[in-house]
Swiss-Prot record:
Name of the protein: Uncharacterized protein HI_0100
Matching Pfam families: VanY (PF02557)
InterPro entries: Bact_PeptidoProc_Enz, Hedgehog_sig/DD-Pept_Zn-bd_sf, Pept_M15B
GO molecular function: peptidase activity
Superkingdom of origin organism: Bacteria
Organism field: Haemophilus influenzae (strain ATCC 51907 / DSM 11121 / KW20 / Rd)
One GO biological process term: proteolysis
Amino acid sequence: MSGDFTLVCITAASRHHWGTEVDIFDPDLLPRGQSLQLEPWEYEKGGYFFELSEFLAENLPHFDFALPFMNMQSNKKVGREPWHISYLPLAELASQQFSPEILPQAWKGENILGADCLISHLEQIFSEYIV
């Protein structure tokens, strides 16, 4: 796999599919007529959800939750997601069990476009995109 591209999500590879993840925002904080964009700037200083972001960062650890897409390892090609919350006790267990061998099994019987290409690059995809 070469070139620059954005990998949004591979079927069955999203942490949301584990049932341990949730995206959070407060619709009451959006300006009238503004739709949610789920962009990091919305959660940064000057953004609609900055105070929510500060509250989450301070309080989530007290309840075994974390923001897994905030301080990414330099080898990962995944964007920051300050809205993405993970329940650590279950997410860590799922993460330990999730491997490149699991995805092709999950895809059996499904019509996944590009599956052969994805399968041939699963090791690289896992090392660069799976958190």
